[in-house]
Amino acid sequence: MSETALLVVDVQNDVMAESVNSDDVVAKISSLVDRAREQGVPVFWVQHSDPGMPRDSDAWQVVPQLVPAPGEPVVHKTWGDAFVETDLAERLQERDVKRIVLCGAQTDACIRSTFYGGIHRGYDMTL
């Protein structure tokens, strides 16, 4: 089993609609997801919700170019850091993950918060 996991954060319709070069970003993330799956690296998905992007709304959905495969964990968060008030750490521990390759949307917000949250919890983080 791989000690590395790919963590895909907030690549959702509403978030990507406001992103610069979103088509390029999604294509690069799609390539990472494909390579992770080919190499047996677990892929974890994170979706953010808040009053402006309610859970289960169209805005909240992962962009159609990126679809979590059956069995890939999806973590729902309401804070910038995907570790805060979620079961992400427990799910990673269940798979003995020690290294996280982090990608997604809003590098200045949720990616940065999750990056530091992972470091704080002892993970080897790659952005």
Regions found by a protein language model. Name each.
Residues 84-85, 110-112:
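Short, well-ordered alpha-helical microsegments
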Residues 93-109:
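Active-site neighborhoods of divalent-metal-dependent phosphate/nucleic-acid chemistry enzymes
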Residues 4, 107, 114, 126:
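Ser/Thr-centric signal marking residues that sit
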Residues 75, 102, 118:
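Conserved, mostly hydrophobic/aromatic
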Residues 14, 80, 106-108:
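Short glycine-rich anion-binding loops that position phosphate/pyrophosphate groups of nucleotides
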Residues 111-121:
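Short Gly/Thr/Asp-enriched flexible loops that form oxyanion-binding sites at enzyme active sites
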Residues 1-77, 89-90, 94, 98:
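Active-site acidic carboxylates
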Residues 43, 125-127:
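Hydrophobic beta-strand scaffold residues
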